[in-house]
């Protein structure tokens, strides 16, 4: 950086000097003859050459009419380079005649300039090379720190600490930067399919004696939690036990713990009971926008299409409240029925405990049959010793789920045939972005999968609330083409709504979790009018100048005219008609029936099964198994390679993202939902049509 600045300064000074000498060369003979010009030029150069800016020398030039000149060198001997240059001027005065003075000076200057430039560039090049290799060495060292050698004991307990990882759609490599910043402890994302495979492997592994689970702090989507619990339930069928220990149970954590053979709880008071039932919070910010002088104009089709409602109302519409109540009740019925069945009680009894707040103290949990025994940690260790058949707790060897998954989730490279799993996770957006479901990028991925002859079946894993209609159309077009060559099976995660349903409605078979949120077959467009805020709050007046009558239609400085509203409404209606027709074709039902269950309404997977929007309640594992069996000559998933697209981040990519990534300043605060609400403005291009489910839905 210092060398670069020095180079720039030197170039500027040399250019300025040459410019001044050009002027000097054009003076009249009265002001400077050939010899006089030489002396003056040499003097100028001496004065300019002091790169150290230290006035330790002076050069006095005297002009003699007798065609002689000399340089009075007073104190300049201290500067050897200047002495050399000035001597050159005096000894070769005949050469520097007229304009040749300038050429000679330029030649000398350029030699010095070139030498300095080359030296500087060489230094920069060497520095760049060293920095490049040093950076990669550091990244490699940090990546190595993030890796550890996993060793499987001869006999072990599979330890599942739900607070140490989060269930995600795809596994990603551990980011060592996170570990460094967090002081050595991080929450690792583990893909749901990898987690399920690990549990399945443990069921058949004679080295794994039982599962010890700490369910508190469980994180993941509702569908991911549901799939994980099903895998635990299947583990029990192997005859091996699951024991859980909880201190502060919540909805998701107790839902997981309830599958256990035994549930132990701390006897100590003071822990907060978060097991109170599910809740969906709807946020409305119209009053806030009114105070800011912002008016949002919403054009939509579907009485249940509540996306954007938060901007135009201060409370929920009747239809939106209806669908949210039914959605939360359906989700809770799924969880409550499984909890009740596992604990040998009725759902009515369970709901009564929660409604009457009967689970206040640890003893209440035992009395109501939700916990088997209260144990302090020493007593818990003895229980684990008894199950492991060990004399002391130090002999109870364990391996974490994430480490065990690393050992067991290996690719079957011997298999020549592949099942591709395309993970459509996040908002559906236009362009080629690496995050979310970018239309151009995913169309390219699907096209590549179609052209890969080793891929003989495809699972489309959808975990998206929808988004851009244009991007959805691009993705669906490629999927339709893919279906002409290979079977495409859909698997729904937490969301497969609106645009998420658009891209998957024509799949050969659709699996959905009971807690999946799907449907939301509707369309909307949204235009904010910020003219009032600009004029009244910022005191800025904007006057449009248009070539045509509606040139400023999307200028945001005025409300739409009735004619413009009709124009946009016609576009929304046209897209809605296309949406219902493609659902009719994909699901084999009349358009009129599709319209009845559409209207933008959100359905849970359990309800979607009854109305024909999905084919079967099942997990990602079920969809992959079905896809494998659809391949000729394949008897099961063990005979194929399962490959995921897009490829997950590498350690290096995760490190770079850590350095350049963004953070949510509202995360974990009461304002997080409001921050997300304002963030919705940035997700929509003005005037575009979107197929997206209602915005901020938080289920706890």
What are these regions (language model features)?
Residues 111-151, 155:
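N-terminal type II signal-anchor transmembrane helix
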Residues 149-151, 156-283, 411-533:
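Cleft-lining beta-strand/loop regions that shape enzyme active-site pockets
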Residues 414-419, 423-454, 645-700:
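Intrinsic disorder and flexible/low-complexity segments
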